[in-house]
Design a protein with these regions (language model features):
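Surface-exposed, low-hydrophobicity beta-strand/loop segments enriched in small/polar/acidic residues
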Residues: 2-168
Length: 168
């Protein structure tokens, strides 16, 4: 008779969100432009408490975004996640990170499938399990949002992101 050890893996599951409100303008985005909250002040968006402890491994198992814009051509965007805060381009500037910042990228989540209503739209990343790791002394990740298509925003457009995280 052989005995095999039983292996149980338990995950601490959390849902984390962030909100980004665009500037009060309607300047069109080009492919690879940064979507940000300011045209003059650059900063990455902190996604706090991704890890329960510093340096924790996590899996992103779902990513969703809603927008207050019901555009005929919805935005296709990517959420770039870093384990240390990168310098950020301002809104509508070309997305450009340094080689050093590229070394701190822990994942990129494309959100390109959108549905719309007459008042808003919603996108999601499909079937994913993206393993990430927080920095050794941090429980947060830092996000930059990048347009992947030419996109006509509305003034003060609000993007709300939700991330489903499994802490391992």
């Amino acid at each position: 008779m052989s005995v095999r050890p039983e292996r149980n893996i338990f995950y601490d599951k959390v849902e984390l969100g962030l909100t980004l409100t665009r500037p009060a303008d309607t300047v069109q985005y080009a492919d690879n432009d940064t979507i940000a909250a300011s045209t003059s002040t650059a900063y990455a968006i902190e996604v706090a408490n991704v890890g329960a402890v510093p340096g924790q491994n996590v899996n992103v198992v779902g990513a969703y975004c809603s927008s207050t814009n019901p555009a005929a051509t919805p935005v296709s965007l990517s959420v770039w996640l870093f384990n240390s805060p990168p310098a950020s381009p301002v809104d509508n500037a070309a997305f450009a990170i340094t080689d050093g910042e590229n070394d701190t990228v822990v994942g990129v989540i494309p959100i390109s499938t959108w549905v719309k209503s007459s008042n808003n739209s919603r996108g999601q990343a499909h079937t994913m399990k993206l393993p990430l790791k927080c920095a050794a002394a941090d429980t947060s990740l830092y996000a930059l949002i990048v347009a992947n298509n030419a996109y006509q925003p509305i003034s003060g457009e609000v993007f709300k992101f939700k991330f489903h995280i499994e802490r391992t």
